[in-house]
Amino acid sequence: MAQHSHETGGGQGFPLLTDLVSKDSAPLFVENLLRGEKPRAEWMCGVEFELFGYDRARSFERIDAEQVQRVLAGFAPSSNDIVHEGGAVVEVNDGQMNRLTVEPGGQVEFSGAPQRRLADVERELRRYLARLREVAESNRLTFLAVGFDPLRTIEEQRWFPKMRYEVMRPYLAARGRRAWDMMCRTCAVQSNLDYGPPADLAKKFLVGNRLAPVVTAIFANSPFEGGRPSGYKSTRAAAWLDTDAARAGLAPPALRDDFAPEDYVAYALDVPMIFVQRGGRYLGAVAGVRFREFLERGRGGLRPVFGDWADHLTTIFTDARLKQHVELRSADGNDLETSLALQALWKGLLYDPAALDEALRLAPRLKGADALVLRERVARDGLAAAHEIGRAHV
């Protein structure tokens, strides 16, 4: 799941993050993807759960960077479990193999350790939320589980001081009118699931993307913006519609019935880069350069290394994406019970072979333009969204 360190290579006989790569490295990237294959008996499930924090003492302003860091530090068993960047607390390990991190607008994200059973996912989420209530109460804070900030405008947002976001902020702003809304004013619940052989990986990726509008509709939970109705069932989904189409929405390879892992690598190679890391710094010298071009010619004196590929994959924001697991990213932030229902839905569809085959058969097979129309209608109307080939409801 998201916690697996080997996703970025470095295993026995496999490149280190610092190893150079070239225009001939596409097979290596495919091999790295396929290293996520696991036997069915070892399949696990993971959850990523985001929340907005508000300051009760300041008329429910969004919490600032100092408050976010206090919240994170409240989960650390010791100072050794705290990750700093430039003096700021940016990540905490809670002693149970779970991580807490921060999104660009100070949203707090719980990344759960992979679990065999949904009951164990529930146990860890309940433990996290119980502790969060204690930390919030001691700091006079309130946390809200919705898909879009219902109260504060983009001008009122507080940006968290993280180097990655400082590079992403201007890049994405130039490529989508609502990119900053996406970064600061959205929260999601994400499901992370394992896969078996390449054919199983392909089915899960296709279903995850093709059913994304249906899942968005079922779990739509963001009808407000600026303290009033926004006109959307999922304002979060609406924000994503105007955020860098080169890396968001329905993954183009999912339009292919003959999809194979090589197609995902080929797609990712043509997605423009945002940054690379060198010496603990995020460098935007590669911004806008397709990864394929970076492999061929480098950029600004920089030569591509294997770790650049791993970083690049984290900047692809499609409804379902691949690392060494499948990430399912189409649902609004929701409360505990609804978030657990989401996990059960995805696990039931993707881990039962008969259900997976039937889901693939029933999932909409849309052309690119039709898929965009469906996403727009789902954002506005949720389960009532109509499309000429059917309705986005179950």
Model-inferred region functions:
Residues Y54-R56, A113, D194-G196, A331, ...:
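Solvent-exposed residues in well-ordered beta-strands and their adjoining turns
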Residues A392-V394:
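Conserved small/polar residues in nucleotide/adenosyl-binding loops
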Residues L283-D370:
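Long, well-ordered mid-to-C-terminal structural blocks that present hydrophobic/aromatic surfaces
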Residues A2-R177, R185, A220, T338, ...:
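Terminal catalytic/cofactor-binding subdomain
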Residues P39, R116-D120, E124, N192-G196, ...:
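Conserved aromatic-histidine-acidic binding/catalytic patches
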Residues E50-F52, Q190-N192, E327-R329:
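Structured core elements
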Residues E388-G390:
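Short, compositionally biased segments
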Residues E137, F143-L144, F148-R321:
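Loop-rich catalytic cores of soluble enzymes, especially ATP-dependent carboxylate-amine ligases
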